[in-house]
Regions:
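Aromatic-anchored transmembrane helix interface
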Residues: 62-69, 84-110, 120-125, 129
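Alpha-helical transmembrane segments of multi-pass inner-membrane proteins
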Residues: 122-147, 171-221, 226-239
Length: 434
């Protein structure tokens, strides 16, 4: 029982970071991510006192420099205009807040686990995803649960209720869907590369069930979730075929492929059963996978929201100065568009958008130097980042911040021989918690 309670508390802490919420009894600006970040700062200082020194890893410093340069450029873009929208002019503050929150998650998990590595992080991300999905179903079906959540948590419920949208505790609309998509990519990575999962049918089943749950319910919350599902499934299939040795199919590959197919068939059978027997579940699935049902029934792979996006929201600058420097306007109310590429160009110009893109390329790719077999995952995270910008401006730096803090896979000897690594900077974080 104690382990279950501890696991539940840690899941809530991670959820507060990944899916930030504001509380009705606190100022709106003080959300759960900031509270976790405050804990992270305190834990970081205490750890510095214990270690007799405060150290920042190379990626966090390089990332901070890049975020600062982007912020300065955005500040320059809004200077001299009548628009004083500082949403990205202070991105360095957002960067620091996410990083502090990530260290808070790392420190909280470190109170229980001797080594907070990628497996632990991914395991709790999966738990958080399932927790949010289950909570969303409870909120949507039980008035008492919805009343409790709406009373204590400020989630912009009026807008969600008007649109008849499902929501969890902080998981809603495209920002929630993008985080679900990221979690699905991380689950696919763990299922495909982690030895503990490879050698344990229970772990394989739990990962696949979590993947399916987040895909189905997460897509009802936000159809953006399906992007992560598609990337994750592609990764799992690629990984299964990469297990061949010398061009031959191995017994281990056959066993894993069989188990994967068996579990997926079970999930599909369960989904079909509930689709036919439950009108509520049927409505969920038809909304979450509207494009698929339109394709089956009409031959057109489309959704109503995508039609609006493509027909009305491609707004581009009308002069060279705005193309290069931007005009400091941002969002649906100022630019009449939600599309990320359009908003970035109108806000800070192509120069700013390129700077921001390079920042994420670095944050995703640098993880290859810290985690083994992470190359495909890095490129999937890059793909996810740039695909979702077709729809919204939300980014996924939260996962990079967590990966910066988690314990790496490589040996400390690798760290000491890294020619790019200054003497007092740690890249790999191979030390276990004490």
């Amino acid at each position: 029982m104690r382990k279950i309670l501890v696991g539940l508390v840690l899941t809530v802490v991670v959820s507060f970071y990944v899916f930030p919420i504001s509380f009705t009894f606190l100022p709106h600006a003080i959300n759960s991510k900031i509270l976790v970040g405050v804990f992270g700062i305190v834990a970081f200082i205490l750890n510095g006192i214990r270690e007799k020194g405060i150290y920042f890893s190379e990626p966090t410093i390089v990332g901070a420099v890049m975020a600062s340069l982007f912020s300065v450029w955005c500040l320059y873009s809004i200077t001299g205009t009548s628009n004083y929208n500082t949403i990205y002019a202070d991105y360095i503050v957002s960067y620091a807040t996410w990083l502090a929150g990530a260290y808070g998650v790392y420190a909280a998990l470190g109170l229980v686990y001797e080594k907070v590595d990628l497996e632990i992080i991914t395991r709790y991300l999966a738990l958080v995803g399932v927790f949010q999905c289950v909570t969303a179903v409870l909120i949507d079906n039980y008035g008492g649960v919805q009343s409790f959540v709406d009373r204590w948590m400020d989630l912009d419920q009026d807008f969600l209720h008007r649109g008849n949208r499902m929501y969890g505790i902080g998981a809603a609309l495209d920002p929630g869907g993008i985080r679900f998509a990221t979690i699905l990519v991380m689950i696919a990575h763990q299922f495909s590369t982690n030895l503990n999962v490879r050698n344990n049918s229970l772990y394989q089943t739990s990962d696949l069930v979590a993947f399916a749950t987040i895909t189905i319910i997460g897509s009802v919350i936000s159809r953006t979730t399906t992007i992560g599902a598609a990337l994750g499934i592609a990764y799992i299939i690629i990984a299964l075929f990469r297990m061949r040795r010398g061009g031959f199919v191995t017994l281990r590959m056959v066993r894993r492929f069989f188990w994967f197919i068996l579990v997926m068939i079970g999930i599909v059978i369960a989904a079909v059963y509930f689709y036919r027997s439950s009108e509520t579940f049927k409505e969920y699935v038809r909304f979450g996978f509207e494009a698929f049902f339109n394709w089956v029934e009409t031959g057109e792979f489309r959704t109503d929201s995508t039609d609006v996006l493509m027909e009305r929201m491609w707004k581009w600058p009308s002069d060279l100065h705005t193309w290069v420097f931007g005009q400091g306007t941002f969002g649906i109310y100022e630019n009449n568009t939600d599309i990320g590429y359009c908003n970035f160009t109108l806000y800070c110009g192509l120069v700013g958008m390129v700077m921001f893109s390079i920042f994420f390329l670095y944050c995703h790719l640098v993880q290859n130097r810290k985690y083994k077999e992470f190359q495909i995952t890095s490129w999937l995270l890059i793909a996810l980042t740039f695909i979702v910008w077709v729809k919204v401006t939300t980014d996924i730096f939260f996962i990079d911040a967590l990966l910066f803090c988690a314990v790496g896979d490589y040996e400390e000897a690798t760290e000491s021989t890294d020619s790019l690594l200054p003497k007092m900077m740690q890249l790999y974080n191979t030390k276990q918690n004490r």
